[in-house]
Amino acid sequence: VSSSIDTADNPFVRVREENNVLLVALTSNRGLCGGFNNNVIKKTKKLVSEYGESSVAVFPVGKKANDAFKNSTYLATDNLPQNSASLWDDLNFENVNSLTEELMSSYKNGDFDKIIVVYNSFKNAAVQIIKSEQLLPIVKADSDSENTDNTDYIFEPSQEEIIVDLIPNSLKVTFYKAMLDSLASEHGARMTA
């Protein structure tokens, strides 16, 4: 179904030249969890060097990322909340939702051309996998080459109305999942440290 929907006019799908990239680094507020925080910080610094300091901004979520990047020249300070570490104190969808809306607004307004989330993905209590996942622009799913089904779908309400609601909600859930993955990974890393 997703391959039959035209999303070209949606601002969250439109690919732009990558002049300003935002890296959202998810770390914890506390230490004593092995390499959990350090892995995110190292991966973020690697991405900064790949994109170039002049075209990157880092938005830290968590005290450890904030401490690591507070004196850097590429710390994101405009149009984003400054006390993002408090999200971990009461992690719920509503709190993450407001941050995600600000990220989407910054992208939609052209402040950033690409937003990447760097976090630890939970595999099990002993293993956390460092991930850098593109949040915006949305990457269109590859259509299966074997699936050549040319079914004509009828949408109620219209495609445009569905997309206007579906894409922002999908982005909110994707970012919330990254936050939950990071929290579960932190607890696993703390147990095995």
Protein language model features and the residues they cover:
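C-terminal beta-strand-loop-alpha-helix "lid" module of Rossmann-like NAD(P)-dependent dehydrogenases
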Residues: 1-193
